[in-house]
Amino acid sequence: SQKQRWLPGLASGETIATLAHAEGAGQTTAKSLTASLSGDSLTGAKKPVADGAAANIAIVTTTAGDGSVTLCLVELDQGTVVRTPIQTLDFSRGHATLEFNNASAEPLGNGTIHWSSFESLLDRAAVLMAWEQLGIADKALEQACDYAQQRYAFGRAIGSFQAIKHKLAGMYVKNALARSNAYHGAWALASDSDTRPLAASTARVASIQA
C-alpha cells in the first residue's frame, strides 16, 4: 500500500514530500485548477512549489470538475517531470515550478476530496506555518537585541539610541501580535470553530508581518 511504501522513508527523513497545489499568482480554487489526471497520466504545471527542487514525491491537486479535487501521488524523479528552480526570499525551501508532461501518477488513497475538506487541510497548514515563522521571528529579535547591546558606536552600545530602541520595540509588538493570532488559530482548529478560515488566515498574515 502507499502507506507501507512511503511512510517509513518520510518518517526517517530519507524521502522528502511536498504539496503541489498553486498554479501561479492569485488564489487557486477548485474551479481554477487546470492540472488534470487521465487514468494514470498527469498533465499540467504547479508553481511555486515549496521544496519542489528537492522533493522525491509530490501530492498534486487536480480538477475533478464537480466542486471536488483529486489528489494524486507523483514520483518526481521521472523524465516526464520538469523542475525549474524559483528564487524566493526563503532559500531553505528550494521552491520550483513543476511541469508534468503525461507523468505517471496514482490517486492518493481514495483520490477525490471535497474542496471544503481540502480547505480545512490548508487552514491547518497555515496555522502550522504561522508557528514556524513566529519561532524564526522570535530568534531574530533575540539576536537583534544581543547585537544592539554588543555593538558600540560613538562610544556607547547602539541599543542605547532611541531609534534602535523603537525598532526593537516594534519587532516585539509584531511578534506578540503574531503569537496571539497563532494561539487563536490553534484554538479554532482544535474546537472546529466556524471562524477557522479567518483565524488561520489571520495567523498566517500576522506571522508573515512579524
What is each residue range found by the language model?
Residues 1-8, 13, 50-57, 189:
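Internal helix-loop-helix
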Residues 9, 13, 41, 120-210:
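Alpha-helical interface subdomain recognition
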Residues 10, 27-30, 49-54, 64-66, ...:
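Solvent-exposed alpha-helices and their adjacent loops that cap or buttress functional pockets
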Residues 13-24, 60:
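A short, Trp-centered hydrophobic/proline-enriched beta-strand micro-motif
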Residues 28, 32, 48-49, 75-110:
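Flexible, small-/acidic-enriched active-site or ligand-binding loops
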Residues 35-37:
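A structural signal for short hydrophobic beta-strand segments in well-ordered beta-sheet cores
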Residues 45-81, 95:
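A short core secondary-structure module
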Residues 60, 72, 98, 137, ...:
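Residue-level signal for inorganic ion chemistry
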